[in-house]
Amino acid sequence: MGSFSIGHWLIVLAIIVLLFGAKKIPELAKGLGKGIKTFKAEMEDTTPEKSEKVEHKEESATSQKIEETTKNA
């Protein structure tokens, strides 16, 4: 009762075609696909940089602890 049936989806599709026109829908889908592809590419580009920064910070923190320990000893 709460989910969409095939009839509901056909009505939604008909409304979309009426609003945008049959020629405009493929262009919109193509633009959406390019946007998603660009977003994923940017996410993959930034991921290695962040992990390198985290590793560098961890190494810095570890080296500082070692220096403090040797100074106190």
Curated annotation (Swiss-Prot):
Its main location: membrane. It holds the Pfam family TatA_B_E. The keyword rRNA processing does not apply. The keyword Membrane applies. One of its GO terms (biological process) is protein transport by the Tat complex. Signal peptide: none annotated. It is found in: Cell inner membrane. InterPro entries: TatA/B/E, TatA/E. Part of the twin-arginine translocation (Tat) system that transports large folded proteins containing a characteristic twin-arginine motif in their signal peptide across membranes. TatA could form the protein-conducting channel of the Tat system. Belongs to the TatA/E family. The Tat system comprises two distinct complexes: a TatABC complex, containing multiple copies of TatA, TatB and TatC subunits, and a separate TatA complex, containing only TatA subunits. Substrates initially bind to the TatABC complex, which probably triggers association of the separate TatA complex to form the active translocon. This is Sec-independent protein translocase protein TatA.
